[in-house]
A protein has these predicted regions:
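Solvent-exposed alpha-helical segments within well-ordered globular domains of core cellular machineries
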Residues: 22, 34, 47-54, 78-86, ...
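Active-site glycine-centered loops adjacent to acidic/histidine catalytic or metal-binding residues
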Residues: 35, 96, 125
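Switch/connector loops and helix/strand junctions flanking conserved nucleotide-binding motifs
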Residues: 41-43, 75-76, 100-104, 129-134, ...
Length: 203
């Protein structure tokens, strides 16, 4: 996608078996890129989902997550985006395969969505390299806290669920937790509401 490696790596579930690493340089910055398995969510139901979640939660949290989503399948891909927002990670979205969206005659106001979710969105075409330079320029801006789009938001799940999330967050703060402090307590609360057994076992 960026480092020029010719490994069999993709954005789709099951294509990447484990993490691949590459190095990319731009504008005086050196990026260590870790390509995690393709997944549509951060649940614990598949090996890919569990691997990605553990990497984000238990390993050293990345400075920036580049969330590569398929421009032709937005609804399915944006579910993962909402979960990353719940995790409160720094993120830039690569709206990949943007040419397929245009070929279908569709238009997408990605700049308005970016402002709504507080996260930069950059159209890309990985097979041609279109948008890659701009993508990493936005990564630099987010890292340097200079991107005007970035803001902290919560996905509102409705009054009933929000009350449950708030109650669980208060309970988490009252007990000793094995989870790193860098992990969003809101994210943990949502996972506990989902009866996520792996999270339950770690709190």
């Amino acid at each position: 996608f960026a480092s020029g490696a010719h490994e069999h790596v993709g954005n789709y579930s099951g294509v990447t078996v484990d993490a691949k690493e590459g190095v990319f340089k731009q504008n005086g910055y050196t990026f260590r890129i870790v390509d995690l398995p393709g997944t549509y969510s951060l649940s614990a139901y598949t090996p890919e989902e569990l691997y990605v979640r553990k990497h984000l939660n238990e390993n050293q949290q990345p400075d920036i997550v580049i969330n590569v989503i398929d421009a032709s399948n937005l609804e399915r891909n944006l579910y993962l985006t909402t979960q990353l927002i719940d995790m409160d990670v720094q993120m830039v979205i690569a709206l990949n395969m943007y040419d397929e969206l245009e070929k279908a005659g569709n238009k997408f106001d990605y700049e308005s969505l970016a402002r709504m979710i507080g996260c930069p969105i950059v159209p890309t075409i990985s097979k041609t390299g279109f948008g890659i330079e701009e993508l990493f320029n936005r990564v630099i801006k987010v890292y340097e806290e200079e991107d005007p789009v970035v803001r902290h938001i919560h996905i509102n799940y409705g009054d009933i669920l929000e009350k449950g999330i708030a109650n669980i967050k208060r309970s988490i703060h009252k007990v000793d937790s094995n989870m790193p402090k860098s992990i969003s307590r809101r994210y943990l609360s949502i996972k506990l509401l989902e009866n996520d057994q792996e999270i339950e076992s770690q709190i």
